[in-house]
């Protein structure tokens, strides 16, 4: 399955809340030819969103894959709050037919100490249990902070949760100077999800996939070599101040065609 994540819509909205533009998101991504939609936790915090998402999913014949999630899991003082929030989000993922939760563990803006990595792992284990109760699989999403400094944060998590599933963001790996093909080969058996985005040689995000320099042909080969059978999600992003040259739906369509042609998915 090749789906899409709506970050590029959320980026300009208050609180990154995609709820006001859900109709546009489903319409655009249906037009683009993707196989499903990965929602964001911001939408699923609204108790009344479930019937609306179900209706949109039926109307556009576009399944909900799951949702992305982020919380400061390293901060033990926030654990009760995170548990309550995540339980509601995960429950709604299941209600709208989703089956994945791609979570980020939170950036401490510094190197986390061992006790914080312990707290982070404890929270992840609890969330994994809630996911399992709802038929949802948790995967670890990454930004730069999880994989910089020789993957310190990620390795700290995996040392504590050896069977954790991964959902790497390929572009953020490149941003952290982690070679994506090597990452796929090293962690292939754990990878159940991946976010796809492209960047130019100067590090600036490209408008659509195929307009940058990331070697997605090699990444596609690496995924096949490691028997990847999970989900890929196109997650476009624009640099600050960027003025799109085409409608977002066209960039998603170009990206979907690129993934099929170049990656073989």
Language-model region placement:
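A cross-domain feature marking catalytic cores of carbohydrate-active enzymes
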Residues: 4-8, 39-42, 66-71, 103-105, ...
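A short, acidic, flexible beta-alpha connecting loop/helix-capping segment that sits on the rim
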Residues: 233-244, 248
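N-terminal pre-domain/capping segments
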Residues: 1-96, 132, 136, 165, ...
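Generic structural signal for well-ordered alpha-helices
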Residues: 22-26, 50-54, 86-90, 121-128, ...
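Acidic/histidine-rich catalytic cores of soluble enzymes
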Residues: 36-37, 67, 126-213, 220
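Acidic-and-aromatic substrate-binding clefts and catalytic sites of carbohydrate-active enzymes
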Residues: 13-18, 39-50, 72-82, 108-112, ...
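A structural motif
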Residues: 31-34, 98, 163, 191, ...
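Active-site acidic/histidine proton-transfer and metal-coordination neighborhood
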Residues: 59-60, 75-166, 173-175, 249
């Amino acid at each position: 399955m090749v789906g899409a994540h709506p970050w590029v819509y959320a980026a300009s909205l208050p609180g990154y809340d995609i709820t006001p533009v859900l109709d546009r998101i489903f319409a655009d991504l249906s037009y683009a030819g993707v196989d499903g939609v990965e929602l964001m936790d911001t939408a699923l915090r609204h108790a009344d969103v479930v019937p609306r998402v179900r209706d949109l999913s039926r109307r556009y014949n576009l399944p909900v894959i799951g949702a992305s999630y982020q919380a400061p899991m390293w901060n033990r003082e926030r654990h009760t709050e995170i548990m309550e929030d995540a339980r509601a989000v995960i429950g709604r993922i299941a209600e709208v037919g989703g089956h994945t939760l791609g979570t980020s563990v939170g950036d401490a803006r510094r190197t986390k100490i061992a006790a914080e990595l312990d707290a982070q792992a404890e929270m992840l284990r609890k969330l994994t249990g809630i996911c399992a109760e709802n038929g949802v699989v948790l995967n670890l999403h990454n930004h730069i902070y999880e994989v910089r400094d020789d993957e310190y944060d990620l390795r700290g998590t995996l040392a504590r949760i050896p069977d954790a599933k991964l959902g790497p963001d390929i572009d953020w790996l490149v941003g952290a100077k982690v070679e994506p093909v090597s990452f796929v080969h090293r962690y292939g058996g754990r990878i159940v999800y991946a976010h796809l985005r492209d960047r130019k040689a100067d590090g600036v995000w490209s408008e659509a996939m195929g307009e940058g320099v990331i070697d997605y042909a090699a990444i596609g080969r690496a995924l096949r070599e490691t028997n990847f059978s999970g989900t890929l999600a196109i997650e476009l992003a624009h640099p600050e101040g960027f003025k799109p040259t085409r409608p977002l739906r066209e960039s998603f369509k170009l990206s979907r065609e690129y993934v099929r042609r170049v990656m073989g998915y």
